[in-house]
């Protein structure tokens, strides 16, 4: 095999279809665009989602939900993540240093996902009822 002898597989390449070049080509006269109408004209296109003047689907459906402005300031931490932390006293600063919450986070809440088997002390963080129960069952406590 030599680089100057490489060829594409048979049938892999197709000549570009030339339109508007006579009856014999099969795509002469109207060049495959049919007769008249918006789509046959030069520049004849419509916006994506335009339904011919009918109220578009996107506007017929109701708006839902909103974007919370406080989302980036409130963090969630799993019990399983706390298990991996090397420190026993857990507060917002420890979570930021471990990269479990973002730098902009102003408050965090512990949720009961995963397992906690060691004793920890939680300072200044919220927790769900089940997360609080799991921490206390493992011998941990909450210091406000």
Curated annotation (Swiss-Prot):
Keyword presence, Ribonucleoprotein: yes
Protein name as annotated: Large ribosomal subunit protein uL15
Keywords: Ribonucleoprotein, Ribosomal protein, RNA-binding, rRNA-binding
Cysteines joined through disulfide linkages: none
Gene3D superfamilies in UniProt: 3.100.10.10
Subunit structure: Part of the 50S ribosomal subunit.
A Pfam family: Ribosomal_L27A
Molecular-function GO term, any one: structural constituent of ribosome
Biased composition (Gly residues): 21-31
Region (Disordered): 1-56
PROSITE patterns recorded: RIBOSOMAL_L15
Organism of this sequence: Burkholderia multivorans (strain ATCC 17616 / 249)
Task performed by this protein: Binds to the 23S rRNA.
GO cellular component: cytosolic large ribosomal subunit
Record-annotated membrane-spanning stretches: none
GO biological process: one example: translation
Matching PANTHER family: 50S RIBOSOMAL PROTEIN L15 (PTHR12934), LARGE RIBOSOMAL SUBUNIT PROTEIN UL15M (PTHR12934:SF11)
Encoding gene per record: rplO
